[in-house]
């Protein structure tokens, strides 16, 4: 549920490397 400061509208989340995932076009972690 914590925003990772990255969007995933056009490209996947790079922050998946630290546990973030794409939700509602924004990358979140927990």
UniProtKB/Swiss-Prot annotation:
It holds the Pfam family Cyclotide. GO terms for biological process: defense response. Keywords: Disulfide bond, Plant defense. InterPro entries: Cyclotide, Cyclotide_bracelet_CS, Cyclotide_sf. Disulfide bonds join 4-20, 8-22, 13-27. It comes from the Eukaryota. There is a cross-link at residues 1-30 (Cyclopeptide (Gly-Asn)). Belongs to the cyclotide family. Bracelet subfamily. Probably participates in a plant defense mechanism. The presence of a 'disulfide through disulfide knot' structurally defines this protein as a knottin. This is Cyclotide mden-I. It comes from Melicytus dentatus.
């Amino acid at each position: 549920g914590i925003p990772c400061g990255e969007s995933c509208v056009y490209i996947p989340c790079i922050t998946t490397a630290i546990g973030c995932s794409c939700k509602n076009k924004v990358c979140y972690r927990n």
